[in-house]
Amino acid sequence: MATKKKSSAANKGDDRQKALDAAMAMIEKDFGKGAVMRLGDDDRPPIQAISSGNTAIDIALGVGGFPRGRIVEIYGPESSGKTTVALHAIASAQKTGGIAAFIDAEHALDPEYARLLGVDTDNLLVSQPDTGEQALEIADMLVRSGAIDIIVIDSVAALTPKAEIEGEMGDSHVGLQARLMSQALRKMTGALYNSGTTAIFINQLREKIGVMFGSPETTTGGKALKFYASVRCDIRRIQTLKDGQDAIGNRTKLKVVKNKVSPPFKIAEFDIMYGEGISRESSIIDLGVEHGFIKKSGSWFTYEGDQLGQGKEKARNFLKDNPDLADEIEKKIFVKLGVGAAAAEAGEDVAMDVPGADDPLTDEAVDLVPNVDFDDD
């Protein structure tokens, strides 16, 4: 009786599998190969990223940069460094042969400043749209082309609906921008994933009226962007850097408040120097000291016995003049923290260096095994 029940269950399982295979075959015929698949059969590589151009930010993001095929939101107060971070990401993408686009809804992009940050302005695609609908339609068309690696929309607050532009001053247009963003993000999300394009939305802060508890700060454009964004970064200026009485830059803090590709709430602190952008070398020194690769004795910084300089500014200039050394220290930091491509390469090297891991058992090796007679008492 038990055998009969087992046989019946097995037959039922076979029938279900055949029905599933038939359904999957029909789905693939109608919607294309890969429309439905088992997760274990997905041969896509791990999450790829576009480096932010700064070691501290790449580590805080957890995957070595801004994830490809995802939406990223960067928000903060005025002059906190939002556009600077986005332009550095564009420069980083261009250095690896990528194509970048910048939707300048604020009509405030400074080409000379972008050039100072390392952006190839001759090959940067720029659009200065008249309306929010036009801006998002252009962005969607560029993404669907499949040729764009990174696109920046600066900013969400400046995406003004057409009805508002054509209307009179003082007219009420409640929820127009929120509906516009919600519709655009619904359309763009799938296209971004399929094309591997990173979309960075820069956003501004507003204050909610009458909030008694919690933070009154909120971002513009409704709630859709908060849901669709895989990464949200809150950026703040925390200190003014001075050389004597002259201000030469800002100490800036970036907090990853939402992260779908790595643990969230990590914080990166870095220096933004006026006329230069984010100082990569300064972050390498900070992280190098923190993780023991760079020794600090008094005001002197040393690396493997070699002096980098007295004072952080001289050490920073030394690393700037010796980019190979800066790359070496940065790679060691990434490997130790298990972040980015450097860590993945190090893992592969360790696996390949295991002695005898791939050696076949040859006849000579077999002959070296002594004969053991288990019948001897």
Swiss-Prot record:
Protein name (record): Protein RecA
Keywords assigned: ATP-binding, Cytoplasm, DNA damage, DNA recombination, DNA repair, DNA-binding, Nucleotide-binding, SOS response
CDD domains with a match to the protein in the record: RecA
UniProt main location, coarse: cytoplasm
Disulfide-bond pairs as recorded: none
Family label: Belongs to the RecA family.
Gene Ontology biological-process entries: DNA recombination; DNA repair; SOS response
Protein purpose: Can catalyze the hydrolysis of ATP in the presence of single-stranded DNA, the ATP-dependent uptake of single-stranded DNA by duplex DNA, and the ATP-dependent hybridization of homologous single-stranded DNAs. It interacts with LexA causing its activation and leading to its autocatalytic cleavage.
Compartments in which it is found: Cytoplasm
Family matches, as InterPro entries: AAA+_ATPase, DNA_recomb/repair_RecA, DNA_recomb/repair_RecA_CS, P-loop_NTPase, RecA-like_C, RecA-like_N, RecA_ATP-bd, RecA_C_sf
Organism: Corynebacterium aurimucosum (strain ATCC 700975 / DSM 44827 / CIP 107346 / CN-1) (Corynebacterium nigricans)
Pfam families in the record: RecA, RecA_C
NCBIfam families: tigrfam_recA
Top-level taxon in the UniProt lineage: Bacteria
GO (cellular component) term, any one: cytosol
Binding residue positions for ATP: 76-83
GO molecular function, one term: ATP binding
